[in-house]
Amino acid sequence: FYSDLGKHKIGSYYGFLLFIKLIIEQKRLNDFTRIRGTFEDFIYQYSFLIQQIVRKYRQSKKAYEHISKFYKCIMDLLIENNNLDIAQIAKEIIKNEEFMYLKVDLVDNEEVQIKGNFSRGKKQQIKLKTFVKSIPRCPICNGYLSTKSTSVDHIQRKRDGGNNSIDNGQLTHIYCNTTYKN
């Protein structure tokens, strides 16, 4: 929920909270877990679409419900079309009447100068790009893992003959290990 310049994006945060609330109420957490990795990749690569939604509604407080609908649209498209790649999902989103105004083409406005210094913003983007590559992923849902809330899981389950060796352990999301996997 941070921009590539490291600033907090309140609209994204509120929109995601509402989205999660709705999928819990609709008992669709397992659906979300199934597509979580691709969902997170999409949000990372197309974060500028959320900025466009906020701009349309002029402030985060007015935009967050639309951002929640945007997240739900992504989830539904990924579930219905699990063979589409992220760019194809972006093209499908703008077929939805509510999101036709979004410009989904990735545009590179970077000005490159020989012997030029990195701006503060570019430095932050380089850090983010580097750190995101190194974030571990949950082997069950392929979503990013937080260092603060993980579960240690048996790769081969105990009931299937799995042992307690280090080689038979993996870090997962708590939900993936305790609820989704079972």
Regions found by a protein language model. Give the residues of each.
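Short, charged surface segments at domain edges that flank catalytic/cofactor-binding sites
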Residues: 93-140, 163
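A cross-family structural signal marking well-folded subdomains
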Residues: 1-97
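Conserved aromatic-histidine-acidic binding/catalytic patches
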Residues: 4-8, 114, 161
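Extended hydrophobic-aromatic, low-complexity segments
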Residues: 25-32, 87, 98-105, 135, ...
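Histidine-centered nuclease catalytic patch
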Residues: 120, 126, 137-172, 182
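Short, well-ordered loop/turn and helix-capping segments at boundaries between secondary-structure elements
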Residues: 22-26, 132, 161, 178
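Generic recognition of well-ordered alpha-helical segments
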Residues: 15, 171-175
